[in-house]
């Protein structure tokens, strides 16, 4: 049984590090039985006064993109599998064509292509979010390197259900890799 103090400390931590405001929007993709989803797609947003939109179907890329296009969330909270599936099916195949591989080796063109891919991905996620917070499982290193290479606004939090769930998190602008965490969640649950 997770004590209420653990849930409260996660909610307080979210207030300290996230910048949601009353009226901001979030698409909830994770089940409420998932501690990560409960803490960071419901409890915090509910306490802030955000509008929470629940997906009523299995979160496939098509359903997710339609919801993001309609709602334009201010924050995206997801598990790695969802982000990995989207990138592996919709982005990487386009970049792995023979012509694109050659263009990606040309310095100035490489930067333009990466900027275009980054902008298209931001628009696919609604175009209005500050960052995507990924957590709940390990992140694929190939996908993480790709996101870093295009300067995509994402971060990876680390946690476990027994901690209700967050252990540490870093804002995307300071986040380097999932191996280097710098901001542990404070724990005073007395």
Listing of model-derived features with the role each one plays in the protein:
Residues 8-25, 32-119, 153:
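Conserved AMP-binding/adenylation subdomain of ANL enzymes
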Residues 3-4, 61, 186:
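Structural motif detector for alpha-helix initiation sites
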Residues 29, 55, 134-135, 178:
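Thr-Gly-centered strand-to-loop micro-motif
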Residues 181-190:
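Single conserved hydrophobic/aromatic residue that forms the stacking wall/gate
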Residues 26, 36, 169-170, 183:
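Transmitter module of two-component histidine kinases
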Residues 1-9:
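Conserved AMP-binding A3 loop
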Residues 22-24, 176-179:
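Short acidic capping loops at alpha-helix termini that bridge into adjacent secondary structure
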Residues 74-77, 87-175:
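Gly/Ser/Thr-rich phosphate-binding loop
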């Amino acid at each position: 049984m997770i004590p209420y103090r653990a849930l409260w400390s996660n909610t307080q931590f979210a207030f300290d590090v996230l910048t949601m405001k009353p009226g901001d929007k979030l698409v909830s993709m994770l089940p409420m039985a998932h501690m990560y989803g409960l803490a960071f797609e419901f409890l915090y947003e509910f306490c802030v006064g955000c509008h929470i939109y629940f997906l009523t179907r299995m979160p496939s890329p098509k359903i997710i993109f339609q919801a993001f296009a309609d709602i334009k969330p201010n924050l995206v909270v997801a598990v790695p599998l969802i982000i990995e599936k989207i990138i592996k099916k919709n982005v990487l195949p386009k970049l792995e064509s023979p012509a694109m591989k050659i263009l990606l080796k040309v310095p100035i063109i490489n930067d333009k292509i990466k900027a275009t891919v980054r902008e298209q991905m931001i628009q696919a996620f609604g175009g209005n979010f500050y960052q995507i917070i990924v957590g709940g499982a390990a992140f694929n290193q190939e996908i993480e390197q790709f996101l870093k290479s295009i300067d995509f606004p994402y971060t990876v939090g680390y946690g476990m259900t027994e901690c209700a769930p967050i252990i540490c998190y870093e804002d995307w602008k300071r986040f380097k890799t999932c191996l280097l965490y710098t901001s542990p969640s404070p724990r005073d649950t007395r």
